[in-house]
């Protein structure tokens, strides 16, 4: 049996050829490599964390695909936090760990687009930024718009790929630009009123009020940031249509207090207001940030509830057991 995190067509075809099972569990969505004819191979056992993505491939006729949310290794994180002697240097009021996607494809190609398309895409992105928990970009990329776009945007596909212009453009171009706008707007607004620490490889020189803390190692340092910060922020990239991104599990598994945008699958596993806090737009985020900075007891209770929930029900052991039972 072969196993990978995320799906690889070459490995699937190899496993199909030699007659062994190929198990993959996606942590990115949508995973462009899945839009390949090899996804129909009988050897595949594909697990995806986004239910919308699962339903899409199920409707295509992919037989061996299942929905499986991501998880967190609380025991590993507990060990890091217990042994830590430098946690205080990661403390702060508000923390954001992640990319600002300032090096995105949209900024590069925008000058080459006609004025109408630039205005249209700017309007689509602005509309998406005002809607929480749903992706509206895909239906806005109409046949007419895509026909105009293909004159200015070249689509390169590998042999066997059935990804199309709409999928590639909404994912690799608009999706990352929307994420950049959302994150910068939120951090700028919050930094007007609160102390905000940003841990990132991105260029934040234009965010004059934030405290730039450099990047942190995912395995050894990031849990300390989440544990020691009063409020941790998550902004789910719109490419993830309904699923719960890994960052949510990471924060809760470190015992951190989490404020996140709404995702459709959050209510399936967590109680908003008890395990984590959801915000709807920058104004709501700023208001709730002020409230929870002032209400420490409530904030700590919510962080503890989220931690206990992922510890008891959402470990990697739980998920691997599910995978093994499914493929048996």
Task: Map each language-model feature to its residues.
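A short, gly/pro- and small-residue-rich
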Residues: 15-28, 62, 110-121, 185, ...
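Short beta-strand/turn micro-motifs composed of small residues
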Residues: 4, 26, 48, 98, ...
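N-terminal pre-catalytic "stem/leader" segment of glycosyltransferase-like enzymes
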Residues: 1-18, 167-172, 196, 302, ...
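Extended catalytic core of nucleotide-activated donor transferases of GT-like folds
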Residues: 1-61, 74-83, 214, 219-220, ...
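Nucleotide-sugar donor-binding catalytic core of glycosyltransferases
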Residues: 63-64, 69-240, 263-264
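A structural signal for well-ordered alpha-helical segments within the folded catalytic domains
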Residues: 9, 13, 51, 181-191, ...
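Catalytic binding pocket for nucleotide-activated donors in carbohydrate/polymer assembly enzymes
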Residues: 39-40, 51, 55-63, 68, ...
